[in-house]
């Protein structure tokens, strides 16, 4: 498992975060984000020191992995997973619900039922497994964006006057698919390594271009992050605001400005 210093270094990757109209060059140093990033880093260090709770042996490979990546096949496995979720929740007194174990569970569930993705062709099931193994082996922090902007939801995505308010496929190429549009409420993405993108709202039969399921690195070219105002910017001090100043996941609007997603990252 990686430690806190490795995690913080991974965030200094040129990601395009904008706050108050200006680009944030380093979320680990900016006062709006630094405290929350440090809390996650501290928990990564604590996870290393608590390996009996936070890790386990992978039944398939025999290698030690983070328990949040364990595909459960028994009641004992479920107990291990419960323990690691409790570990991460205790680190923020329950205030952070989108810590690294959260979307790790989504990807682990995908890998545990890969045949669902094979319905679109075996390639997609293979893609799920490959990315799951990458995220597991590198102990990645993955966030997700699944909620479209608050526009008229009585109108199908494909029938809006501006067709790419919702994120959708602009075109397909040999290299992958090109995504344009925006999602809202991408919680914790400013502190994550990768972003899983899909839809939580129902899609109409004609919305095929919006039926997406994919992953992108947070520093992908064309991906812009527009967070709401972090609570730390309103706190006079960490002493006076010990919780909100340190445990803010920062909901974020993510804008896809023709982001190329390689086929291997499409599920």
Residue ranges and their predicted role:
Residues 34, 38, 133-136, 178:
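Generic structural signal for well-ordered, non-transmembrane alpha-helical segments
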Residues 45-142:
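Internal helix-loop-helix
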Residues 19, 112-117, 237-239:
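Glycine- and acidic
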Residues 139-152:
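A short, Trp-centered hydrophobic/proline-enriched beta-strand micro-motif
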Residues 19, 143-146, 178-180:
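General beta-strand structural signal in soluble alpha/beta enzymes
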Residues 149-267:
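FAD-binding core of flavoproteins
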Residues 1-59:
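Acidic/polar, glycine-rich intrinsically disordered N-terminal extensions of enzymes
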Residues 30-34, 60-71, 157-160:
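Glycine-rich loop at the start of a catalytic domain that most often binds anionic cofactors/ligands
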């Amino acid at each position: 498992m990686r430690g806190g210093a490795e995690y913080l270094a991974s965030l200094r990757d040129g990601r395009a975060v904008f706050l108050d109209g200006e680009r944030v060059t380093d979320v680990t140093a900016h006062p709006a984000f630094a405290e929350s990033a440090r809390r996650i880093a501290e928990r990564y260090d604590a996870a290393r020191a608590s390996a009996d709770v936070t890790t386990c042996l992978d039944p398939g490979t025999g290698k030690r992995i983070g328990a949040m990546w364990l595909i459960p096949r028994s009641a004992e496995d479920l107990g291990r997973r419960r323990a690691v979720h409790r570990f991460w929740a205790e680190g923020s007194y329950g205030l952070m619900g989108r810590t690294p174990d959260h979307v790790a569970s989504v990807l682990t569930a995908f890998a545990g039922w890969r045949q669902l993705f094979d319905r679109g062709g075996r390639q997609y099931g293979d893609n799920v497994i490959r990315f799951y193994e990458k995220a597991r082996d590198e102990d990645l922090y993955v966030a997700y964006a699944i909620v479209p902007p608050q526009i008229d939801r009585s109108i199908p995505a494909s029938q809006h006057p501006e067709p790419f308010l919702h994120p959708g496929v602009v075109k397909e190429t040999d290299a992958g698919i090109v995504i344009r549009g925006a999602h809202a409420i991408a919680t914790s993405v400013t502190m994550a390594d990768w972003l899983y993108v899909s839809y939580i709202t129902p899609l109409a039969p004609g919305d095929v271009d919006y039926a997406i399921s994919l992953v992108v690195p947070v520093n992908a070219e064309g991906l812009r992050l527009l967070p709401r105002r972090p609570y730390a910017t309103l706190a006079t001090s960490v002493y006076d605001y010990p919780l909100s100043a340190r445990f803010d996941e920062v909901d974020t609007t993510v804008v896809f400005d023709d982001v190329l997603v390689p086929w291997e990252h499409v599920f």
